Amino acid sequence: MTQLAQQEKKQTYNFNKLQKRLRRNVGNAITDFGMIEDGDKVMVCLSGGKDSYTLLDILLNLQQNAPIKFDIVAVNLDQKQPGFPEHVLPEYLESIGVDYKIVQENTYGIVKEKIPEGKTTCSLCSRLRRGILYRTATELGATKIALGHHRDDMLATLFLNMFYGGKMKSMPPKLISDDGKQIVIRPLAYCKEKDIEKYAIAKEFPIIPCNLCGSQPNLQRQVVKEMLNTWDRQYPGRLETMFSAMQNITLSHMCDPKLFDFKGIKHGQLIDGIEGDTAFDEEKITPMQFEDEDQTDFSNNEMINFKEVN
């Protein structure tokens, strides 16, 4: 076997391993949080970025193999950003044979009119986009709205809220809208961003860059994301441990009286489910072990560059 053939075989093996891991993670998230039920119509929000492409691709595969029946419709919100390649998503969606709808709303013009030059547009843009997507879901009869946020997004949101908002709050894997009419799910909740990056490169998704928000420097989220990436490089496994912590919360050892009845603690009473007193003990922490998921980087260990389209 030639060296080229060996390399291709290894890349195929690594891609299959990556694909299985992503499908397994999405399937587990759907099961753990009851994201998709029999008879659901899932509206997958497609932006043209790596995350939403991967989400749609994985859900389409699971649709063919799941023990339940559910429909998928892809929706893209064309916000009329200058230079947005309107042909890319329709061509891609038609090529894979999925039902889709392109919603055209000039939110870009509204944002530029309302937000002074140099200020962050994310908040207003997000509110406008959310309202339009909720309306579209109602029009399509969708029972679930699927977004492409992943594990790293959830961790970044947790730290953003701690650093700037004074809250222990992240992105929930499943939520209901304020009016109770829409259920939003995040099936990529267990997926690492670096896995999604590798998958998007291997699949050669026609990535569309975001010129509206991606060009804004010094965003708080970007600062937090860089911090997390630094930790991941310097301390492998730290992000996995932190995400595990989000799923293992001991309310009796936090400080929120709204969530735990500290005033109700009385002499001689033992409350079920509460960990014992560790006030005078040296806390023993056993490092968590995670499976080795090392694999070939499809970007040849260089900075990942997506194939952008115009």
UniProtKB/Swiss-Prot annotation:
It is an enzyme of class 2 (transferase). Pathway: tRNA modification. Its EC number is 2.8.1.-. Pfam families: ATP_bind_3. It catalyses: cytidine(32) in tRNA + S-sulfanyl-L-cysteinyl-[cysteine desulfurase] + AH2 + ATP = 2-thiocytidine(32) in tRNA + L-cysteinyl-[cysteine desulfurase] + A + AMP + diphosphate + H(+). The keyword Nucleotide-binding applies. GO terms for cellular component: cytoplasm. A motif (PP-loop motif) lies at residues 47-52. Keywords: 4Fe-4S, ATP-binding, Cytoplasm, Iron, Iron-sulfur, Magnesium, Metal-binding, Nucleotide-binding, RNA-binding, Transferase, tRNA processing, tRNA-binding. It is found in: Cytoplasm. [4Fe-4S] cluster binds at C122, C125, C213. One of its GO terms (biological process) is tRNA thio-modification. One of its GO terms (molecular function) is sulfurtransferase activity. Binds 1 [4Fe-4S] cluster per subunit. The cluster is chelated by three Cys residues, the fourth Fe has a free coordination site that may bind a sulfur atom transferred from the persulfide of IscS. InterPro entries: Rossmann-like_a/b/a_fold (IPR014729), TilS/TtcA_N (IPR011063), tRNA_Cyd_32_2_STrfase (IPR012089), tRNA_thiolation_TtcA_Ctu1 (IPR035107). It comes from the Bacteria. Gene3D superfamilies: HUPs. Its cofactor is Mg(2+); [4Fe-4S] cluster. Homodimer. HAMAP family: TtcA. Catalyzes the ATP-dependent 2-thiolation of cytidine in position 32 of tRNA, to form 2-thiocytidine (s(2)C32). The sulfur atoms are provided by the cysteine/cysteine desulfurase (IscS) system. Belongs to the TtcA family. The thiolation reaction likely consists of two steps: a first activation step by ATP to form an adenylated intermediate of the target base of tRNA, and a second nucleophilic substitution step of the sulfur (S) atom supplied by the hydrosulfide attached to the Fe-S cluster. This is tRNA-cytidine(32) 2-sulfurtransferase. It comes from Haemophilus influenzae (strain 86-028NP).
